[in-house]
Amino acid sequence: SFAKNKILRKVDLFLYPAKCILLSGKNGSGKTTLLKIVAGLEKPAEAEIEYSGKSLSWKKAIRNILKEIIYLHQQPLLFSGSVESNVAYGLRFTSLNRKQRRESVIKALEWSGLTDLANIQANTLSGGVQQRVAFTRAWILKPKVLLLDEPMSNMDHESREQARLLLCRMKSAGMSIVITSHVPQYFDGLTDVQFNLSNGQLAESEFSASNDSL
């Protein structure tokens, strides 16, 4: 459960492999705060964390679990380099050698349909394409959990469909995805369970948790 300056009160959130959770609610309801707590970017006043059946302290969770979680802001945080260099950035901190990194980037660009844009300056592209670049940069690192804060708020219909397809592929590969949005319809066909955050608490819709939680 989480609590943060009375924005969130006794919130329980369970993450499952290959499942997508949608968090809806009004602006200021605490959706982003909850995501940042899960990502380890904000520390709650109180928290109970269980991972693979074991209880962990906040310090151990930060050290052992959160490296498997990627949080993406509403606005894609891309630097002034090519699409390819943006996608490759995170691999610099892995054990892969230069050849392996190059091969991984080529496969990731093919996976996301961005091969033809590989040499284009990423920050000159439309918001929808920039978000796909951000998704690809996350995907190449193979996190267990992907946290997305209003990922489709600045996209047209075509861009949303392209982004939703990438998210479906991530989920099919076993990734756990948590999304905040005030427009749940954007994620039809992707979401497994939806929560509405109101007055600091989550109201859960029906969900059959057939898989083991993380």
Model-derived regions: residue spans:
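Conserved catalytic motifs of ABC-family nucleotide-binding domains
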Residues: 76-85
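Conserved ABC ATPase signature
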Residues: 121-125, 129
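Conserved ABC ATPase "signature" region
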Residues: 99-117
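Conserved ABC transporter NBD signature motif
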Residues: 47-58, 65
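Helix-to-loop junction immediately C-terminal to a conserved catalytic motif
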Residues: 39
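Catalytic Walker B motif of ABC-type/P-loop ATPase nucleotide-binding domains
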Residues: 146-149
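Hydrophobic anchor residue at the start of the ABC signature
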Residues: 135
